[in-house]
Design a protein with these regions (language model features):
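HKD-type phospholipase D/PLD-like phosphodiesterase module
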Residues: 2-212, 249-294, 303-310, 314-316
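Structural motif
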Residues: 82, 218-220, 299
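Long, K/E/R/D-enriched contiguous segments that form extended
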Residues: 205-252
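Alpha-helix capping/termination and helix-coil
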Residues: 214, 218, 238-241, 245, ...
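Long, C-terminal catalytic modules of enzymes
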Residues: 282-284, 288, 293-381
């Protein structure tokens, strides 16, 4: 789509300038959008660019398809990177789509690249990427790199890049990144295992342990799909006097039908853990994945509070020790809570900006049917 072409044109331009480009794409996304696609092959054909597919689709091993690459990040040299939960499609980038998902990522800038980098989040992320890239699960992109369509798309991407420069000149001006960022006490990368198989829940272990160390935790997640162990862990938090609140999409606004349907089935179990759930109703669906602990710790990345992110997918989160960042995200959370409803003492209470949206008859029937279908499939949603 248009957002994807924006990204590919920028990557191709960088390759033309001699930048070494490596792109790794999830297997199912690769099967649907990348393999044999002349737009991606135009990039992969460049001498300075490579595209690989993590866990490519193999119909002889359908059970392997469940393990997906869910990380989203961009590393530039040894100096800067951005990491979060945003996908590179019209729904997440630009102004191409009426329906949008609001997301959050962090930009990290190293002021002294190349020195004392051993224990930095930059070195941790570079090591993580290399391990994924060199994994036996990652394969080259398939397709003809010398075909007529590939050559045509190469020229189209070069032309498109020039059009973007004219349309958005401010985006191409040199920036003083140090002035645009602020210092933190520490940044640590959290991850799941990378093998394309059922995973030990490293990410959830880490998040739960960090929340247990605090007095209050706020969780942002687009949807909630918990298994028994995760329910037990949430109950353990509240039993130990950790105040936990979750901000998630109202069913009438959520963009993921599986997550919305599971919430209709499971919301009473969630409430019984003692957490307070804010069902967020805003102009756009929220895709943010973050955890705030007390007034110092902010954790942002790709992890959803669901069983897929916990047991199946690769995931990355940045744990940032910074009162300044925590205050920024907490201010956003307080604002979002005014657009939410929450269950208290058996009754819903409504934030001052919450506006009820009724589900259409068609959607009610759809969810009623789906509520029965998904019960045995919850782990894989």
């Amino acid at each position: 789509d248009e957002a994807g072409q924006d990204i590919l044109s920028a990557l191709l331009n960088a390759a033309d300038r001699g930048v070494d480009i490596r792109v790794i794409v999830d297997g199912i996304s690769g099967f649907m959008d990348v393999q044999h696609n002349p737009w991606f092959l135009a990039l992969d054909a460049h001498k300075n660019a490579q595209v690989r597919i993590y866990n490519p689709v193999n119909f002889l091993k359908p059970w392997d398809m469940q393990a997906r690459l869910h990380d989203k990040y961009l590393i530039i040299d040894d100096q800067m990177y951005t990491l979060g939960g945003r996908n590179t499609t019209n729904l997440f980038l630009g102004d191409y789509s009426k329906g949008k998902n609001i997301d959050k990522e962090l930009f990290v800038y190293e002021t002294d690249p190349g020195k004392n980098m051993q224990n930095t989040s930059m070195s941790q992320l570079q090591t993580y990427f290399d391990s994924i890239w060199d994994s036996s699960d990652s394969k080259p992109c398939r397709g003809s790199r010398n075909g007529k369509k590939t050559v045509e798309k190469t020229e189209a991407l070069k032309k498109h890049y020039k059009e973007l420069q004219k349309k958005y000149p401010a985006a191409y001006e040199k920036q003083n990144w140090e002035e645009l960022t602020f210092e933190t006490n520490k940044i640590t990368l959290l991850s799941n295992p990378i093998e394309s198989e059922n995973k030990e829940p490293w990410m959830w272990y880490s998040l739960h342990r960090l929340m247990m160390s605090g007095k209050q935790a706020t969780i942002y997640t687009p949807y909630i799909i918990c298994g028994r162990e995760m329910y037990d862990d949430l109950s353990q938090l509240t039993d130990n006097n950790v105040s936990v609140e979750i901000i998630t999409n109202d069913v009438a606004k959520g963009a993921n039908p599986w997550g919305c349907t599971d919430y209709l089935n499971e919301k009473e179990k969630i409430w019984r853990t003692g957490v307070k759930v804010y069902e967020y109703m805003a102009p756009h669906s929220c895709h943010t994945k973050a955890v705030l602990i007390d007034d110092r710790m902010s954790i942002v990345g790709s992890y959803n509070l669901d069983m897929r992110s916990t047991y199946l997918d690769t995931e990355l989160m940045l744990a940032v020790d910074s009162t300044e960042l925590n205050a920024i995200i907490r201010k956003e959370a307080e604002h979002d809570k005014t657009f939410s409803k929450t269950m208290e003492n058996g009754k819903y209470t409504y934030g001052e900006n919450y506006k009820t949206k009724e589900l259409s008859t068609g959607k009610k029937l759809f969810y009623a049917t789906l509520r029965q279908i998904i019960k045995p499939l919850r782990r894989f949603l």
